[in-house]
């Protein structure tokens, strides 16, 4: 068993040495390509993309099982070490706080929202006349729900959330969970056995 382990480590070391030259050749980009890559804007990810994108764990977070652990696991589970909270990745850095809107930007945002509501009312009246008012109303609810459920990346800087109506300063409420804490509780905790 020790011989197989030594062979595995040697093969992994050789693969690491072979991978290094190819990585260094890829890093020799021209300055124009680097500038182009730096100026290319990233598309904001929506709430649906966050749920559909699979992010593999980095190799450093994947622990190699010891021989004693490998012998104790049932056959077929050798590649999956048990979950432990010590393997959690550190939380991502917090973005800087949003800058408050200037009065000009606030009036523009208010007028755009007012125009959207007026357009919605005019279209609702038109569809009521055509006897499709209920269908239009229900379908338009999906749009307003989408606008209300956008992720933080998609919101404009300084745009208030719906929560700020009930908690104007958006201050933490004693005993409540943050979104990160709730997500950690829902996703990282093992499922309860029934």
From Swiss-Prot:
Quaternary structure (record): Associates (via N-terminus) with ribosomes.
Disordered: region residues: 1-43, 58-104
Residue ranges with Pro residues bias: 82-101
Family according to the record: Belongs to the SAYSD1 family.
Comment on protein domains: The middle helical (MH) region recognizes and binds ufmylated ribosomes.
Membrane-crossing segments per the record: none
Tagged with keyword Membrane: yes
Organism: Bos taurus (Bovine)
Protein name per its UniProtKB record: SAYSvFN domain-containing protein 1
Chain segments carrying region Middle helical (MH): 102-116
Compartments where found: Endoplasmic reticulum membrane; Cytoplasmic vesicle membrane
GO biological process, one term: rescue of stalled ribosome
Segments of skewed composition (Polar residues): 22-32
Keywords: Cytoplasmic vesicle, Endoplasmic reticulum, Membrane
GO molecular function: UFM1-modified protein reader activity
